[in-house]
Amino acid sequence: MATVIAKVKVMPTSPEVEKESLKESLKELVEQNDAKCRGVTDEPLAFGLYTVYVMVEMEEKEGGMDPIEEAMNALENVESAEVVELSLV
């Protein structure tokens, strides 16, 4: 099987969401889903809002990134999470 690298774009619910706490929650969630977190970055968006990008490495399997994406969307302070890049290594 191949290794999959995915970039997930995560939007917090508001600018008041504590950035470092959200990043730590995302890292833990990735590792709980049998994947490796290869980095978490944030970029300013507008009016204090920011976007978080999570790089995920995992073995290719049926369902792919769907379980991780769904789990991220279920987090309390996450407005949306979507895979924006996906590649095989």
Swiss-Prot record:
Gene3D superfamilies xrefs: 3.30.70.60
Stored Pfam families: EF1_GNE
Family matches, as InterPro entries: eEF-1beta-like_sf, EF1B_bsu/dsu_GNE, Transl_elong_EF1B/ribsomal_bS6, Transl_elong_EF1B_B_arc
HAMAP family linked to this entry: EF1_beta (MF_00043)
Protein name: Elongation factor 1-beta
GTP-binding found in the keyword field: no
General function of this protein: Promotes the exchange of GDP for GTP in EF-1-alpha/GDP, thus allowing the regeneration of EF-1-alpha/GTP that could then be used to form the ternary complex EF-1-alpha/GTP/AAtRNA.
Key words, A-Z: Elongation factor, Protein biosynthesis
Family: Belongs to the EF-1-beta/EF-1-delta family.
